[in-house]
């Protein structure tokens, strides 16, 4: 059986990682999202959720469930708590990604390759788990506008979050492929159709 290529999609804030992941999935790849895995872990994994509550306290609970906005408020201005949270979540996320990958690898392998959207790939030392890295980049002004439109948060919040990440330029330098996402959706789709065909060639 041929090895299923494992691809990570990463990049800066509001650069279009989810759009790239969605388009490649529509073209035929198997896709998972670290953010969706985190949501599942916090809502359904008793072991992980209890560790998070032990770290952050019951103030992050609403109706006895972890509320993500309350969690965010608790950690994003506290480096110690944020680091502690990441130490809980990152191994659990990579464990779930690997489980899903092995399930596809052990099946009839109907997908041409496996992709995982991992925003903090380099920050969490996760590049070693993947065969290929794609970094999505966009001009800072475009990313800022997308961030403000989608989250209704301020430029200050955007800059604060960006400051906690490796720069988009550094992520692009480290990656195997770079996808520029400054234009229209149709332009992005066209560039990804070409990349998709290249990624399928893997032995």
Curated annotation (Swiss-Prot):
Disulfide bond annotation, renumbered to this chain: none
UniProt binding sites for ATP: 14-19
Keywords annotated in UniProt: ATP-binding, Coenzyme A biosynthesis, Cytoplasm, Kinase, Nucleotide-binding, Transferase
Subcellular localization: Cytoplasm
InterPro entries: Depp_CoAkinase, P-loop_NTPase
Location of the DPCK domain: 6-203
EC number of the protein: 2.7.1.24
Gene Ontology terms, MF aspect: ATP binding; dephospho-CoA kinase activity
Involved pathway(s): Cofactor biosynthesis; coenzyme A biosynthesis; CoA from (R)-pantothenate: step 5/5
Primary site of residence: cytoplasm
The keyword Zinc-finger appears for this protein: no
Name of a matching Pfam family: CoaE
Record field: transmembrane: none
Gene Ontology BP terms: coenzyme A biosynthetic process
Catalytic activity: 3'-dephospho-CoA + ATP = ADP + CoA + H(+)
Gene Ontology CC annotations of this record: cytoplasm
Protein task: Catalyzes the phosphorylation of the 3'-hydroxyl group of dephosphocoenzyme A to form coenzyme A.
HAMAP family given in the database record: Dephospho_CoA_kinase (MF_00376)
Family: Belongs to the CoaE family.
Name the record gives this protein: Dephospho-CoA kinase
Name of the gene: coaE
């Amino acid at each position: 059986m041929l090895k299923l290529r494992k691809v990570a999609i990463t990049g800066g804030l509001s650069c279009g990682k989810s759009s790239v992941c969605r388009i490649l999935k529509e073209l035929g790849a198997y896709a998972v999202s670290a953010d969706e895995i985190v949501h599942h872990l916090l809502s359904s994994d008793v072991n992980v959720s209890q560790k998070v509550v032990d770290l952050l306290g019951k103030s992050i609970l609403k109706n006895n469930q972890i509320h993500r906005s309350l969690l965010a408020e608790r950690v994003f201005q506290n480096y110690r708590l944020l680091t502690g949270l990441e130490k809980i979540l990152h191994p659990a996320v990579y464990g779930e990604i690997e489980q899903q990958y092995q399930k596809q690898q052990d099946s009839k392998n109907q997908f041409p390759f496996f992709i995982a959207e991992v925003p903090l790939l380099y920050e969490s030392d996760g590049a070693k788990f993947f065969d290929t890295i794609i970094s999505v980049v966009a001009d800072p002004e475009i990313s800022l506008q997308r961030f403000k439109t989608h989250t209704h948060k301020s430029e200050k919040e955007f800059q604060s979050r960006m400051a906690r990440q490796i720069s988009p330029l550094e992520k692009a330098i480290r990656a195997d492929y770079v996808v520029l996402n400054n234009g229209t959706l149709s332009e992005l789709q066209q560039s990804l159709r070409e990349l998709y065909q290249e990624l399928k060639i893997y032995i």
